[in-house]
Every structure is written in C-alpha cells, then in structure tokens.
Amino acid sequence: MASLRKTHPILKIANSALVDLPAPSNISVWWNFGSLLGLCLITQLLTGLFLAMHYTSDIETAFSSVVHICRDVNYGWLIRNMHANGASFFFICLYMHIARGLYYGSYLFVETWNIGVVLFLLVMMTSFVGYVLPWGQMSFWGATVITNLMSTVPYVGDALVQWIWGGFSVDNATLTRFFAFHFLFPFVVAAFTMLHLLFLHETGSNNPTGINSNADKIPFHPYFTYKDLLGFAVMLLGLTALALFAPNLLGDPDNFTPANPIVTPPHVKPEWYFLFAYAILRSIPNKLGGVLALLFSILVLMVVPFLHTSKQRGLTFRPLTQMLFWVLVADMLVLTWIGGVPVEHPFIIIGQVASVLYFSLFLVLFPLAGMTENKALEWN
C-alpha cells in the first residue's frame, strides 16, 4: 500500500516539494538561502503577528505603544528586537540568494527569476512601510522623502502623493494605511513564494557546474533537509546574538526621538539594506532621473537573462566574468557606504562613478565578457 504522504491530496504536494523532490547531488551551501528566506518569512510573520496584537496605528500613541511593547509586554523587547533585526537577516539572505543566482546562471529559469524579482520588490515595499510604524523621526522623514518621489510621475504626480498620504502631509491616515499594508504584504509575499517554488519545480534546481544533473539526482529528504537545518541553526544563532547583544546596532539613533514634522533630522537615510539604491537615487542631480535610476537599479535584474551571451551557464569556469562579478559585489558595498554619508565632496563623485559602474556591469560588461570568453574558447 502506498504511503499516505504520496496519496493524500495535500500531503502529496508537500511531499513532491520537500521530501521526494529530486535534487542535484552537488548543490553547495549557496543553495541554502532559499530555505533560509522561507524561515525568515515565517519568523517575521510570527513576531509581526504578536507585535500587531499590542501596537496601535495612531500618531498620538504609535511611539508609546512600541515603548509599551518593549517595557510592559512579556518578552515584548525580544519579539521587537527579533522582528527588527529579522528584517536585516531577511535582506542579507535575499542579497546572497540573488548573488548566487547571478553567479551560477540560475536567472536562465526566466519565470522563476522574474517572480523572484517581483518578490524582492514586494519585500522592499513591506520593509519600507514597516519602518514607518514606530513613528520615530527617521520613520516620519523617511516616509516623507520616499513617498514624495512619486511626485515625479508626469501630470498625476502631486495628486498621487496626496492620494498615498491620505491628506496634504504624512499624517494619521498615512500611518493607518501603512500599518494595513505592512500586515497584508507578507501574506502576498507568501503567495508569490508558492509561485516561485511552483515554477522552480517545473525545471528542477540548477547546480554549481551549470550542466544538466538529471543523471545524478538525490532525494531532498533526508540529504537537504538536514543540510538546511544546519543553515537554520547558524542563522538563528546569528539573529538571536544580534537581537540580544546589539539590538540597535543596525538601527538609526534618530528613531528614538518621536516624530516631529517641525524638525528635520540632519541626514535622512533609509535602513542599511536600502542604502545602495538610495546612493543611486542621490547620484543623479535631477528628481525624475534619480527616481528612474532607483527603479531600474532593481528592474535591471529582469533583463539579465536576455543579456546572457556566454555558451556556459554559470561563472564556475569563466574567470573574466568572475572578476566582474566580484567588482559588482565591491561596487554594491561602495554604494551602501555612500548612501549612508552626507552629500558632499568627494562622496558625490564616488557615488556617481559607482552608479555608472553598477549599470555598466549589468548592461555592457557582463555581456561583453561572455562573448570574449566564447571567442577565447573558439565557441562562437
């Protein structure tokens, strides 16, 4: 008689995705980040749910309610610290996951990749509206600056901004709707994650060699379930260490001050994981141009599959493009640094050079390097 996990209508879906799934035998630790992102999402959903039970989305009481959570709610300080720092770990895993996709050519699974980019945008939106909720100085001014970017939309821009605000400035209506969005979006992310997996399982996983691995597949359980559990343990150890020993390390000191529309903080900047995009936005001395650059800094990922010129899939045996890949990583780090410093010389020019390099790598240098390597191997 067949096992229940293979016959039950619901269990057989889980079985084909998590137990009997044929996986390449040689996928490395870089393939752990997908499941780590799943763990991050579950952690954020649970901690967020418990925070929402005590939070009030009203400008008079929002800041106080967060203080109340940290002081008076049983383990509220821990739940809040896990949630705030969990977002940082979510983005660390996201960037590692995207970097893995770029390095090993996983973007050639175009549907899976594009849904992944949409997921990335959704998580960024969720994070942004969540950052506004504590209603500190950086929450308020961050919301003001970023929503104001919508005013660059031709003709309807100003109306669009007021529509998002629910009034003539960032006010109570804005906070209330942002809380509603922050509660809703993670479930949308969860739904898109299911689609992401659905499309991935149509093709099967890629692997470090970039060649077809059908001849050498192993079951996901127990091999990769245990491998993933090790990743879970390492990440949770890092998250709890950060949440317990240095919970405010990655936050902004300005957010300990309640929002004040009269006083602007000296440097308005987003959370560290958005600084690279913020640097690209600031590097163009034109509002519309900056907004478009900001948008395309993420959407450029969608064109990567169509600019793949190499006859090989990954970068495992492509030293020239490997070098460019690590230049991209260094460039992202430079942009992250520039996004967090004041707009003055020499930071302005460094940011502009780093921004030009960022787009050049994706749109020009990677495709050129692929063609060069084909020529060197006489594969043209």
Swiss-Prot record:
One GO biological-process annotation of the entry reads:
mitochondrial electron transport, ubiquinol to cytochrome c
How does the cofactor bind to this protein, according to its record? Binds 2 heme b groups non-covalently.
Q: Which residues form the signal peptide?
A: none
Residues that coordinate or bind a ubiquinone: 201
Cofactors per UniProt? heme b
In terms of superkingdom, the source organism counts as Eukaryota
Annotated residues that bind heme b b566 are located at 97, 196
Assigned keywords, A-Z: Electron transport, Heme, Iron, Membrane, Metal-binding, Mitochondrion, Mitochondrion inner membrane, Respiratory chain, Transmembrane, Transmembrane helix, Transport, Ubiquinone
Q: Kindly give the SUPFAM superfamilies that the UniProt entry links to this protein.
A: a domain/subunit of cytochrome bc1 complex (Ubiquinol-cytochrome c reductase), Transmembrane di-heme cytochromes
- Asked if the keyword Electron transport belongs to this entry, the reply reads yes
Per the record, the major location class is mitochondrion
Its Gene Ontology cellular component terms are:
mitochondrial inner membrane; respiratory chain complex III
Which residues of this UniProt protein bind heme b b562?
83, 182
| Gene3D superfamilies per UniProt | Cytochrome Bc1 Complex, Chain C (1.20.810.10)
The membrane spanning regions, by residue number, are: 33-53, 77-98, 113-133, 178-198, 226-246, 288-308, 320-340, 347-367
UniProt-annotated location(s): Mitochondrion inner membrane
Pfam families on file: Cytochrom_B_C, Cytochrome_B
The family classification in the record reads: Belongs to the cytochrome b family.
List other remarks: Heme 1 (or BL or b562) is low-potential and absorbs at about 562 nm, and heme 2 (or BH or b566) is high-potential and absorbs at about 566 nm.
Q: How does it assemble?
A: The cytochrome bc1 complex contains 3 respiratory subunits (MT-CYB, CYC1 and UQCRFS1), 2 core proteins (UQCRC1 and UQCRC2) and probably 6 low-molecular weight proteins.
Q: What is this protein called?
A: Cytochrome b
